[in-house]
């Protein structure tokens, strides 16, 4: 892809928050270049907040450049204080090392199928652990002005809170990230660092340190922080983060998350997250606005993102579960799909045995009293495993795979019961 076309596309998608000299950057990227993005290990899985920078690396690779994914085995031991209200809890070296391995594996498994050339994977612990304290302060620390560092908005916010402040440990984080850029520039000729807009101060420090240590000019580009139209952070639900690991967030729940995006956000998210062209997205929006009924944008977004993260099989599974719940054909689900619902798709209770339906409705919270439970049954409002139910008894042989009952009240209230295995 032509360099100008690449940056024009990023701008049209709203993916450029801040950048160093844009004309210089466009000129530089007329030739193949190397860029990187860092990912600190704060858990054993990435979440959807990491998707935009990972997808950004792919956008550059599709244009003929080389992306580097840096896992912060060293910086993850410290914790980035940028715009955090309080000090991060420090994790043990063993925990961080396990997370580093998990993230590296996850990034490779997620991204490699979508790339003609895999991302280069690096761990900043590989170079940081060999630097002595004295050498670090002499060779790197001397290039940083405390006066300038305390003027950063992210630091000023913490200093303004006497109940929190900022420790020397977190205050020094910027030095470590800056040295990463200088190191990658020296070893991989890396010319650009990308990151969230909260990383702008750290990126600028890295640009300055690289110039001082290596005598080269490098660049930075930040992505917008993803928020919903109401100003709240995107990517969290009442149940917590939306993880990319299927064992933490099932493909079904992942699919449903995107399917439930607000109309005010969905077209912006199609630009951020998908590889549909801007023209295609504009056409989707125009079609949705012209027709009466549910817009197609949420379905398209959910399909694109679930396919990208969980593959065709994950998408098809999520769609089968969604269709089965809608149609009542729950006996069409396989055991793995029922386990997805057990994991996070439906409220699930584990019971030793089930024979009394009134008790079942009380246990699942679908009825608040025995009287109400009987009324629901008499009125035909209850379905069990897709079948309308008005009896007060239930045989275990009716359980799906001898384990599961999916109980439905009305059109939208669902609960699941798993029979405890003897």
From Swiss-Prot:
GO molecular function annotation: ATP binding; RNA binding; tyrosine-tRNA ligase activity
Motif annotated as 'KMSKS' region, chain positions: 233-237
Quaternary structure and interacting proteins, as annotated: Homodimer.
Chief place of localization: cytoplasm
Gene3D superfamilies from the UniProt entry: HUPs, RNA-binding S4 domain, Tyrosyl-Transfer RNA Synthetase
Single GO biological process annotation from the record: tyrosyl-tRNA aminoacylation
Source organism of this protein record: Vibrio vulnificus (strain YJ016)
Function, in words: Catalyzes the attachment of tyrosine to tRNA(Tyr) in a two-step reaction: tyrosine is first activated by ATP to form Tyr-AMP and then transferred to the acceptor end of tRNA(Tyr).
Subcellular location: Cytoplasm
Keyword set includes Nucleotide-binding: yes
Classification via InterPro entries: aa-tRNA-synth_I_CS (IPR001412), aa-tRNA-synth_Ic (IPR002305), Rossmann-like_a/b/a_fold (IPR014729), S4_RNA-bd_sf (IPR036986), SYY-like_C (IPR054608), Tyr-tRNA-ligase (IPR002307), Tyr-tRNA-ligase_bac-type (IPR024088), Tyr-tRNA-ligase_bac_1 (IPR024107)
Protein name: Tyrosine--tRNA ligase 1
Signal peptide (UniProt feature, chain positions): none
Cellular component aspect of the GO annotation: cytosol
CDD domains: S4, TyrRS_core
EC number annotated for this UniProt entry: 6.1.1.1
Family membership noted in the UniProt record: Belongs to the class-I aminoacyl-tRNA synthetase family. TyrS type 1 subfamily.
